[in-house]
């Protein structure tokens, strides 16, 4: 009898599960819906559309009148060509399918099946209506039962399709015993002591805000002042206090200020103010529905600077009731996503290459950019250099381009556009190469302004020129130094400088990508947290390196980068900049050194100077600090770039470490390069239809002598190291790194050295065993 009762209860549970069973059939029926079959059609019956020519296409000639069609397959059988498409059939049946769906929703009775017995999908509104009929007390139970069913469908089970898994008794008991989650009372803490907790909440909100009385003179809106208060800016910088009123007054502005002086907000605040003036009273729903042209277009020379500008302006707009939509258009990211963002963007920030690629393929985007109210060119001296950014010139020409059939009245309907240009260096003489021969002419500010006026189409004849530091381009709190060393000893002195500045965020600049790829693994082998950044890295890897380097808890990190990181990057806490190579131009030295000593902070810039770089270093000092010498201003010290003396005895103790690390890093780099070269030659041989033999190819090229022979021999030697030899070198280096560098302890007489034995007994930590003097940067 007991078994029968169990069977009956089991059948009752099956009978009670009919409604979920229909839900299962309903969802599987959607998957079984077949696509419309494709049939051969005539060419004339296809829905041809006329091709719209882009505005950037200057000479179309015979390409006018082209037509295109989508979703068509071309099938060729011998000499017979047929066109296969499903478009005509879908057009004929489109209305019938829509009417059928509407009838099924209204019937509600036999909506799941028709006369033929075929399963049809049930729309979601019927499910919602059944939920509304259930009392509120039982809604939670129904929802809880529905959630495990979704998990079973995702995970899959042994039951066949269309059947439903019957819950066991244990599962039922667990569901019944499981207590329901009671809603959390968010105001529980306030109920305990309302007055106390309310004022604590107000104190927490106001903790990060500062007084913004210094911004009142600029006549900014209350939303902008509140945002500046949350960002912690109590007063404007000199470039902001002079440039913002001119921009708000409607003038074209050329702004020059030292690195780290707040040039981003100098043009970002007026742009946001103008947007709030025009669209600030609209709600979010009205903003989504409205179609409006972008307010500003900002051009940047590098991807990293573009993303940083986006972050700064987005932070400024955060917390406002209504704020502009900021979109970044850079390479390395999805083009389709950027096109969607541009369709609703109010402020567009991008690099010239990707921006030109996106807008040149869309007439709507190019037409919208012609209506921008602000054109901002950040780091203008770099963007407008001849032969560097061809796309930037194309974009500037496209913004001013008008068709011949357009009337002059249509041109007047476009809103007036302000052109804002900002950089730390406008001097043309700073862009000349330091390694060149002969005398190089200096150009004054008037010639630099003429250069800009030729490149840009300013609305005013003479834009407002704002120069807050006409004498020096360098930051006031920056200390500059130089270490003289041999060309092959730069790695050794670089490691010594890093050990002399422990727990300092350091940025190392090189002139080549190869140097970045070589130095980064070498420093990592020496237990230094080094990261790399160069233009051949994918965008995600570049952003990941900057993120790891700029973490607040990673103060001793090192970033080895090319000049791609020299302009505009604002990474907090960078205290030291090391120039592994002499910069090619003086303006690049200014921008490299500007990554430290930003705002009111202090920093150091050290140049590693080899014998072949002495002439270039003299020219660098003459160009960068010439105005200081003429005006008798600047630093009080005898030299503008002081020569630093590093103890040669200390450097010699570090040489075994660096030698081992170089061998390990060079071996890995040579093997990687060999594999890359072999793949390239092998692919070329396959394309030519020639058999490739690596040994024969290497034998043919081995007899050649000339430039690069010594380098190739070293690479071959490093490539020939086995795993065992590399492992032995790593073990030897590990033993050296485990010991502190002995710079003051006598191995024979313990008490005769300069080391404090008491500190040794206490277990004092550090890289040095003994006292090491500074390198002289601390002295004024």
From Swiss-Prot:
Residues that hold ATP according to the record: 257-264
GO MF annotation terms:
ATP binding; ATP hydrolysis activity; RNA binding; RNA helicase activity
Q: Where is this motif: Q motif?
A: 213-241
Name the keywords, alphabetized: ATP-binding, Helicase, Hydrolase, Nucleotide-binding, Nucleus, Ribosome biogenesis, RNA-binding, rRNA processing
Compositional bias segments (type: Acidic residues): 94-107
Enzyme Commission number(s) of this protein: 3.6.4.13
Q: Which domain of life is it from?
A: Eukaryota
Specify the Helicase ATP-binding domain's residue ranges. Answer: 244-444
Basic residues bias locations = 19-37
Q: What does UniProt give as GO cellular component?
A: nucleolus
Keyword ATP-binding assigned to the entry: answer is yes
Please report, in chain numbering, the residue ranges of the motif DEAD box. 378-381
Q: Where is this region: Disordered?
A: 1-47, 88-192, 700-721
Cellular location(s): Nucleus, Nucleolus
Q: EC top class, in one word?
A: hydrolase
SMART domains linked to this entry: DEXDc, HELICc
Say where the protein is mainly found.
nucleus
**Biological role stated in the UniProt entry:** ATP-binding RNA helicase involved in the biogenesis of 60S ribosomal subunits and is required for the normal formation of 25S and 5.8S rRNAs.
Family label: Belongs to the DEAD box helicase family. DDX24/MAK5 subfamily.
- Give the matching PANTHER family: RNA HELICASE (PTHR24031)
Q: What is the UniProt domain comment for this protein?
A: The Q motif is unique to and characteristic of the DEAD box family of RNA helicases and controls ATP binding and hydrolysis.
Per its record, how is this protein called by name? ATP-dependent RNA helicase mak5
Q: Which organism is it from?
A: Sclerotinia sclerotiorum (strain ATCC 18683 / 1980 / Ss-1) (White mold)
This protein's gene is called mak5
């Amino acid at each position: 009898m007991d078994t029968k009762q169990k069977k009956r209860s089991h059948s009752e549970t099956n009978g009670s599960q009919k409604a979920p069973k229909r839900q299962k059939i309903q969802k599987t029926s959607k998957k079984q819906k077949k696509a419309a079959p494709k049939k051969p059609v005539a060419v004339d019956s296809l829905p041809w559309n006329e091709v719209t020519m882009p505005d950037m296409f200057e000479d179309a000639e015979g390409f006018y009148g082209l037509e295109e069609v989508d979703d068509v397959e071309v099938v060729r059988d011998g000499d017979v060509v047929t066109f296969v498409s499903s478009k005509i059939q879908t057009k004929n049946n489109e209305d019938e399918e829509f009417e059928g769906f509407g009838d099924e929703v209204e019937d509600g009775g036999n909506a799941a099946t028709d006369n033929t017995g075929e399963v049809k999908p049930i729309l979601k509104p019927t499910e919602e209506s059944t939920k509304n009929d259930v009392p509120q007390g039982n809604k939670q139970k129904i929802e809880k039962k529905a959630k495990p069913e979704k998990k079973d469908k995702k995970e899959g089970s042994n039951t066949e399709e269309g059947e439903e898994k019957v819950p066991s008794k244990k599962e039922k008991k667990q569901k019944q015993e499981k207590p329901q989650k009671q809603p959390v009372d968010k105001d529980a803490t306030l109920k305990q002591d309302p007055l106390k907790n309310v004022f604590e909440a107000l104190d927490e909100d106001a903790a990060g805000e500062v007084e913004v009385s210094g911004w009142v003179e600029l006549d900014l809106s209350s939303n902008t002042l509140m945002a500046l208060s949350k960002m912690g800016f109590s007063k404007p910088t000199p470039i902001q206090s002079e440039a913002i009123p001119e921009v708000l007054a409607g003038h074209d502005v050329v702004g020059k200020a030292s690195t780290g002086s707040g040039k981003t907000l100098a043009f970002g605040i007026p742009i946001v103010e103008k947007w709030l003036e025009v669209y600030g009273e609209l709600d979010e729903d009205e903003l989504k529905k409205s179609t409006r042209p972008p307010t500003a277009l900002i051009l940047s020379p590098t991807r990293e600077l573009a993303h940083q500008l986006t972050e700064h302006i987005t932070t400024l707009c955060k917390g406002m009731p209504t704020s502009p939509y900021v979109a970044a258009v850079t390479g390395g990211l999805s083009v389709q996503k950027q096109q969607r963002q541009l369709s609703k963007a109010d402020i567009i920030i991008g690099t010239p290459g990707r921006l030109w690629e996106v807008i040149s393929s869309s007439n709507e985007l190019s037409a919208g950019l012609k209506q921008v109210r602000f054109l901002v060119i950040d780091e203008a001296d770099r963007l407008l250099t001849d032969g560097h950014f061809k796309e930037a010139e194309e974009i500037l020409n496209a913004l001013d381009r008008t068709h011949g059939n357009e009337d002059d009245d249509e041109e007047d309907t476009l809103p007036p556009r302000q052109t804002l240009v900002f950089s730390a260096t406008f001097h043309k003489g700073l862009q000349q190469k330091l390694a060149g021969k002969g005398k190089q002419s200096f150009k004054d500010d008037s010639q630099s302004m003429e250069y800009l006026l030729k490149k840009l189409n300013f609305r005013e004849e003479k834009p407002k020129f704002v120069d807050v530091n006409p004498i020096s381009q360098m930051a006031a709190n920056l200390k500059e130094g130089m270490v003289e060393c041999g060309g092959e000893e730069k790695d050794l002195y670089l490691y010594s400088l890093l050990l002399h500045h422990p727990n300092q965020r350091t940025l190392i600049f090189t002139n080549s990508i190869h140097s970045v790829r070589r130095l980064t693994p070498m420093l990592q082998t020496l237990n230094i947290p080094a990261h790399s950044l160069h233009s051949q890295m994918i965008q995600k890897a570049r952003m990941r390196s900057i993120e790891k380097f700029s973490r607040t808890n990673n103060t001793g990190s090192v970033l080895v980068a090319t000049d791609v990181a020299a302009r505009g990057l604002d990474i907090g806490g960078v205290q030291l900049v090391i120039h592994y190579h002499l910069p090619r131009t003086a303006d690049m030295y200014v921008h490299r050194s500007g990554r430290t000593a930003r705002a009111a902070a202090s920093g150091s810039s050290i140049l590693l100077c080899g014998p072949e770089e002495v002439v270039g270093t003299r020219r660098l000092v003459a160009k960068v600090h010439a105005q200081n010498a003429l005006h008798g201003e600047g630093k009080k010290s005898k030299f503008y770039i002081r020569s630093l003396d590093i103890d040669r005895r200390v450097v010699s103790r570090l040489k075994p470490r660096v030698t081992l690390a170089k061998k390990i890093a060079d071996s890995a780099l040579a093997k990687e390069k060999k594999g890359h070269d072999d793949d390239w030659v092998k692919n070329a041989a396959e394309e030519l239809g020639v058999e490739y033999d690596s040994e024969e190819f290497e034998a043919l090229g081995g007899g050649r002598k000339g430039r690069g022979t010594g380098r190739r021999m070293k690479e071959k030697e490093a490539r020939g190291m086995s795993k065992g030899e590399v492992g032995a070198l790593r073990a030897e280096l590990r033993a050296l790194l485990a010991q502190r560098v002995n710079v003051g302890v006598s191995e024979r007489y313990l008490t005769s050295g300069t080391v404090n034995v008491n500190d040794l007994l206490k277990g004092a930590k550090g890289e040095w065993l003994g006292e090491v003097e500074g390198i002289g940067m601390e002295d004024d």
